[in-house]
Amino acid sequence: MAFPAFFRNAAVFESALAEEPPLATSPGDVCGITVPHHLLAADLIARAFRLAASGHYERVIALFPDHYRKAARPFATTTQCFQTAYGPVCTDATGVGKLVSTDPRIEVSELFKVDHGIHAVLPFVARFFPTTKLIPIAVSVTSQNEDWDACVQSLAPLITTKTLIVQSTDFSHYLVRRQAREHDQETLNAISTGKPEAILQLRQPAHLDSKGAQYIHVKLQRQVNRSVAEVIENKNSFDYLPWDTWLTTSYIVQIYRKPQPIPSPLPVYPGQQVSFFAGDTSFGRYMSRPLQNKVIAARLQKHILAITGGAPLVVNLEGVVMERPFPTSLSVLRIAMGVDRTTAWLRAMNVRAVVLANNHTLDFGAVRRLRMQQLLRQAGFEVLMHGESRDLKAFRLVALSDLANHGEQRTHLISEADLVDLQKRRLAQPILTFVHWGAEYLAQPRSRELDLLAKLRRYGLRLVIGAHPHVGSAEVMPLGGNSP
């Protein structure tokens, strides 16, 4: 016998699907999604399912909070099927049987009959994956970290290359809009680390209505699929009901994709702006000869655009752009770049802003640096020197350099005055900064960088992009808002 349909009318789902049309290109192998269960935000549920729609799944594992505290154990499941507005969703009785027989923390329950946490997403499962089997898992709001770890170990063997994990979770609850934004930023900080232990710092329901579901999902994806969450939207019930500013609920939509050599660009949705940032960029020195080879140059350009999808790019340009003839006394520590080649490459990569706050802009003196600024501006690029900022629509970008190759002082160049000036610029826009700092070939921040990072955070910076070390960081450090 199946649980009856909780939402019998398909109109709300059809309306949401109409708002989120099918994608023109596949986003890659989607192995997990996190969606709301408030149908006020049904368009966001539809958006995530559209991203997963090209997948061929044999099993869906659905995680959601036990809203009405009906589970007597940390987790509950069922072998019963579900009716929806789009037809039945059948359970994977074999998979459920394995879970119940091997994990005493999981019980069979009737709670699924009335919980909107599962019923809000099942119509989309039936609509997109009508033959896929379901393993539903209700996560008790009183379950603990050790329970979640045990659940991960129980679920992991059931995840194959044809499994989609659907996490049904709403985020900050019962807060005014300003507080909701602060709590969402804290949650985004935790998600950005890609670490399940970061979720443990969040509070329930101030940050989300199921820490357990988020923790289990993050850990499963990391352990089984080597995947981390990508946030594609963060909205609040206020965005749908602008007169209701009290006791809001927020939504953070996430997708997980299996690793790709070159990740497929995700769609840019209404109200969003996607920008990419490139660290040390140069078309001189060691890059000069390879770029003369048309095959190599075309391959490199294709690779870059495959990553960015042609989205606007901000680069830290190392060296001096100049007209020929070049100076005769060139060394590996002085980088010269021809203006024609450099501007052609910047246009091809859709570079919007060029940061010249670094240790190579004075390689050929102040006059050459000034001429470089003129050449780049004449070519149509925004140019930022140390301490300068530019409005790039969705954010304001500030350029800072803590290093120089010339002059008496070559380190510790970012002053307290620079930081105070940042605070004066605090506007409605988020402030991002491109910082030239650190030591070459050292990916970890030293005490100087950590000290600056603390100050930048205190002065309201939302994102700090570092350059100079020639190696990428292994992880993202939370910044912006408060860390929980």
Functional labels for PLM-detected ranges:
Residues 29, 57, 248, 272, ...:
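A structure-centric signal for secondary-structure junctions around beta-strands
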Residues 124, 136, 251-253, 314, ...:
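Conserved hydrophobic/aromatic beta-strand scaffold that supports enzyme active sites
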Residues 40, 172, 259-261, 438:
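Short, glycine-/Ser/Thr-/acidic-enriched flexible segments
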Residues 150-153, 244-251, 397-402:
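Short, surface-exposed amphipathic charged segments that create phosphate/polyanion-binding patches used
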Residues 35, 255-256, 400:
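Hydrophobic side chains in beta-strands
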Residues 261-484:
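Acidic, metal/ion-coordinating pockets
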Residues 2-242:
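Active-site histidine-anchored catalytic micro-motif
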Residues 234-263:
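Long, Lys/Arg- and hydrophobic-enriched amphipathic alpha-helices
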